[in-house]
């Protein structure tokens, strides 16, 4: 591996802007200046403007946070100022040189992420139509203009006017002969591009025949058109229109990938350049220079925030684990770029559907829920981005020796095999005669012997990495497979993770994760290795220190800890991996543990996918994770009004608030911090009261002496559910004050930042959510001692117990196959590489399991001893259990939805005075709304008093929102209870007597 992968990303990023700035300055900007030359004469300001591109400079903004600290404050934006010298010749003055700020670009790290407002953001790819047309009337004739994107900022313009066609590339007209460069070309290279050769030969035939075709609703001579072009890419684009109208070779839908091109956020950032580098902005800038006005970089800063901070194609980087980080790199926006701030935009259903040409390039399974369903997906693992085109890698051609590359256009021209498999039945191998192929945008069954296809579509070409690591994926419902792939990205890294007994061939580390590892920058020998530092001595006897930083707190308070994989005395080369993240073990994805699971029943606690776990999981710290809470406090200063200071002694003493303040004024207690404990307290020292004149008069009447006003602010305390240990606090001072107000940057600033790190150990608890790799998830309902669990005749107790009904009801059979193979691996101390699709290798699953068993050299009676149908005994009586029992060994993960962060309790009270509803929010110790499922949960736990409180009218939100009441009809909870009683043939009605003479009014629920 090469250690300069991160540097290559950085160089490509900088070179993109440098090249595009040069092209724009040499073509577009100069043409704009010449176009507005008459305007300069009228204004009598400019005479000439000259750009010095060779003196282009990059100026970095001030980094007010530590470069080694991974946790940044919420206002941190790191970017470059790109400046270019301008020589401006005025009419009445001498020439002057100015350093003009043309664009601001964000900084990127070695992983390709940018930092915006203190969080790492990930720019994703998005699709856009490569061809757009505009029609207008000029001199009573219709003129059509077609804009076709070729490369980054290079566009092809085709103008159709009065049976004439004119082709431009940006602003240059094409008039050269096209086929002069192809007369003596012999196509002997076996790595050729199918689409280009097909286009050249096809248009050559058109030239020889000298036929007129009806293109763009106009009759154009092909011979004349060919003589006026010179680029093969242009010829391919024109041939695409010919095929659409004549051959019907491609799909005419605009949603097809043929008509789209992939774009990145670089194009969005470069839009600032076209808006900022205009002659009017330069004139305003020079006007401020002439009249000595104060110049701010506010315009480019506003453009920077407008294009990046609220950009829909820049997402937050999810770094909860390695898989979540990796899947974000494959994101793609199929809908395209939109400036709309409304999330509930309306998109046609045809765009949300899976297109036929997505197969092999875009993952057809993975998509988010909600409004963006079908609009945001992930690229398949084989898809690469080559010159802003999606190309396929893994395609085998029978005429070539090696694998070749084909693009989207060639894919639609040839047949493609979708499931080329071999079945094994009765120990005999035979080939399938009929096979399903993808031809002419349809799936057809053809004879395999007559129609030989030369391209195979593998599973690797259609799924992403989170689906490929799931064994027996195709033995499940597709919805459960999608749920399992998403839950891999929500799994918490554990302290003690394990290798799965059942794995796939895609479970190894991907090449994209190379930037997440700590690599060597030189050749040398390892001198020292420990948990926080690796020392390497190079060939010149220099010592290089690589710090591992055991706990790097990242976005969303997640962290990454590194573990060294080298030893003392080992010789290393450049690019050698020295340390891996904690969720990678031996270069494999290890996010969970092997769970000895018993599919059985346990006094009803396993109902509705609930899980009963063994208490030994807590004692041995299995399924234990670590999390951080970071609290920040800013001390600001206003030169005219106030200054904020820390307070050493508290103004009010509260015996419930434990505190120990040091000489700095912050908490120095290293003990366990509870809810409500004070971390720091600050006061606002008012310097002047001249703004509020009325308050100033009252203050002078009360205090006749010259006294200053001190305002006591709310202290920084531990939030509910954030109990932990204070392991570190930072005091960050800035040599340059951090700006708080954009209008007055020199007055209102922050001069100090206090940051507290609370360390939490999250052990498994009741209410935590566990899941398997097949979408089977459940909540921990009870923690049982080891002596209260059933056991085998060898004294083995399961780690957890769950119900087998949910798996069969959801057609989730892959977990049984995985658990059976994992149980064999536990007993025989081996690991099994399982296929994703069982039917690719064997016809029956039972035969596959028997083949695994027969491959192990054991006695015949071992099958009975190690059978998955264990004979469990009751822990009370010791007799054999008669109900259904099944012992499996699946791989389980711990999800991020922990009970400590979700549970919220309160006493009766704290109702709103207006609506008489419970207050909302954790800060005010509020509660949540109760729905129908919550009422069912209270009924199952026998919470009669809580249900009685919910049955009152004050719990009905809709009743209090409507002020026109037409009689009391009861709360919604009371209606749910009466409907459930009707299911058991108990009818409850309420009768109201308004008067002796009136009839009775009956309310039926």
From Swiss-Prot:
GO terms for biological process: DNA-templated transcription. One of its GO terms (molecular function) is ribonucleoside binding. Its EC number is 2.7.7.6. Gene3D superfamilies: 2.40.50.100, 3.90.1100.10, DNA-directed RNA polymerase, subunit 2, domain 6, RNA polymerase alpha subunit dimerisation domain. Keywords: Apicoplast, DNA-directed RNA polymerase, Nucleotidyltransferase, Plastid, Transcription, Transferase. Belongs to the RNA polymerase beta chain family. It holds the Pfam family RNA_pol_Rpb2_6. PANTHER family: DNA-DIRECTED RNA POLYMERASE I SUBUNIT 2. DNA-dependent RNA polymerase catalyzes the transcription of DNA into RNA using the four ribonucleoside triphosphates as substrates. One of its GO terms (cellular component) is mitochondrion. The lineage of its organism: Eukaryota, Sar, Alveolata, Apicomplexa, Aconoidasida. The keyword Transferase applies. It catalyses: RNA(n) + a ribonucleoside 5'-triphosphate = RNA(n+1) + diphosphate. InterPro entries: DNA-dir_RNA_pol_su2 (IPR015712), DNA-dir_RNAP_su2_dom (IPR007120), DNA-dir_RNAP_su2_hyb_sf (IPR037033), RNA_pol_bsu_CS (IPR007121), RNA_pol_Rpb2_3 (IPR007645). It is found in: Plastid, Apicoplast. In plastids the minimal PEP RNA polymerase catalytic core is composed of four subunits: alpha, beta, beta', and beta''. When a (nuclear-encoded) sigma factor is associated with the core the holoenzyme is formed, which can initiate transcription (Potential). The keyword Transferase applies. It comes from Theileria parva (East coast fever infection agent). Its main location: plastid. This is DNA-directed RNA polymerase subunit beta.
